[in-house]
């Protein structure tokens, strides 16, 4: 059974002080409309676990989904969407930044990028930002179905080349529509959980 199959909504928060008690957490982050919520739904084999919108910027809080009793999937606000009030955008930046750099229970980051437009400036900033935390990042080049196989291979090779200086970063093609790459994501995330010390092993209840 997929490690994501038991995912269910737990809580949503808008301030660091409201974060739930610590469990092992894997967070999803990406530019607005990169396919982040669709990726979560596809991995969980659900249609409406995470809200999917054609309007960028709809994920405005940190949403927690529990896996068993000891693990969370975390859906973070999308970045790069300009059509929100400055005060709201500033709050997102602070909330996202503090969570990524200070959340001790965060064991890995799934960074979603549109395969047609990978490694935009804000994506690169996110990689540098999270580098400080010293935890692994796995990039999903989403919407791969929009590219031919030849184009996919070219994009994947180019992204890997540009990430040569990031030893803790891995990358793959992914399509929510075609369910391409689901098994690879599961293996990566399971590896993160399996690497936890036994007393914190969030896979025990999955």
From Swiss-Prot:
Keywords: Cell cycle, Cell division, GTP-binding, Magnesium, Metal-binding, Nucleotide-binding, Septation. It comes from the Bacteria. Its cofactor is Mg(2+). GO terms for molecular function: GTP binding; metal ion binding. Mg(2+) binds at residues 37, 59. Residues 22-195 form the EngB-type G domain. One of its GO terms (cellular component) is cytosol. InterPro entries: G_ENGB_dom (IPR030393), GTP-bd (IPR006073), GTP-bd_ribosome_bio_YsxC (IPR019987), P-loop_NTPase (IPR027417). GO terms for biological process: division septum assembly. PANTHER family: ENGB-TYPE G DOMAIN-CONTAINING PROTEIN, MSS1/TRME-RELATED GTP-BINDING PROTEIN. Necessary for normal cell division and for the maintenance of normal septation. Belongs to the TRAFAC class TrmE-Era-EngA-EngB-Septin-like GTPase superfamily. EngB GTPase family. This is Probable GTP-binding protein EngB.
